[in-house]
Structures are given as C-alpha cells and as structure tokens.
C-alpha cells in the first residue's frame, strides 16, 4: 500500500488528484484538507463510483489508521490509491506549526 505525508500531498497539483476525507460528515463540516470530498469510510465501497479513476485518490481519516481499509478497497477496484500518513491530525499539526512560526516571526499574538 502506498502512503503519502501531508507535506507531500499539499505540494501536489490539486487539479490532478482526488482527496477523500473518510471521517464522519460532521467532522468533515468542521474542517478538512482543502479540496477534499466527503465519503465516510463506511460508505466507500458503495460510493466509490463517485471518484474519478483517472486521478490518484489520497485517503484520510482522523489518524491515518482507519483509512487503510478504504485504500485497500479502492486498490482492489482498480484505483490508484494511497493513505495519508497521520490523517487529518497531521494536517492540523502542520497548520498549527505554520501559525506558530508566523506568530514568532511577526510578533503578532492576535488571532
């Protein structure tokens, strides 16, 4: 199974990939990776036809553990799929790190 880090994912041309957010819909509405589509992990098998086969599909969940099963399902159906290491939490850590760096550089302590 292929994997990708959040840093690698964010460097890709978003028009050439599909990011599948497999977290529950309520978690997705609170925030997700830019451009991600919401298909909860329990629905991937029945809804995978919504995903374009001509683009690689990168799958995330909260931590990058539960999404592994969805990657295997997609691969078995002929998709070029990979798991996003660390899931949505890795995205949040990256964004927080960027904010702290900005805050430390600018001295701006206001949110």
Range-by-range predicted roles:
Residues 60-61:
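Short, surface-exposed ligand- or partner-binding patches at beta-edge/loop junctions that are enriched
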């Amino acid at each position: 199974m292929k994997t990708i880090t959040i840093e690698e994912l964010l460097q890709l041309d978003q028009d050439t990939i599909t990011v599948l957010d497999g977290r529950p819909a309520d978690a997705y509405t609170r925030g997700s990776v830019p451009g991600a589509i919401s298909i909860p992990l329990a629905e991937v098998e029945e809804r995978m036809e919504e995903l374009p086969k001509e683009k690689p599909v990168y799958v995330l969940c909260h931590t990058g553990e539960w999404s592994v099963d969805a990657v295997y399902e997609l691969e078995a159906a002929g998709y070029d799929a990979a798991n996003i290491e660390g899931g949505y939490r890795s995205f949040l850590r990256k964004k927080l790190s960027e904010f702290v760096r900005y805050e430390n550089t600018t001295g701006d302590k206001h949110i």
